[in-house]
Amino acid sequence: MYMIYGVSDCPHCLRAQALCMESDVDYAWVMMDWSKQYREHIKSDWKWKTYPIITKMYFTERTSSEVLVGGFDELQLELLSLDQ
């Protein structure tokens, strides 16, 4: 499952969401509109300078982990590689 940390007026954020829908992959949209301080915190945590910040969640019976995919371009490349 992908997590899309995005802002509602960000074209690349909306394109990432649309790409997940078109590709029929599970995703969750995390709206980052409301707190500029939290947006900056998330960018710092993931060491990514722009939105969207896209991660992939991995689940096991007892744990979960979240790995950075990148932005829209990186998501697009990853989904294209899954199609092959």
Label each region the model flagged:
Residues 1-28:
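Local sequence-structure signature of Cys/Sec-based thiol-disulfide redox active-site neighborhoods
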Residues 45-56:
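Structural micro-motif
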Residues 39-46, 78-83:
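Short amphipathic alpha-helix with an adjacent loop that forms part of the alpha/beta core around
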Residues 5-6, 25-39, 49:
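Thiol-based oxidoreductase modules, predominantly thioredoxin-like and allied folds used
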Residues 12, 38, 75:
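Short phosphate-engaging motifs
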Residues 9, 34, 74:
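Residues that form or immediately flank small-molecule/cofactor binding pockets and catalytic motifs
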Residues 56-84:
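Non-catalytic, surface beta->alpha helical segment in thiol-disulfide oxidoreductase systems
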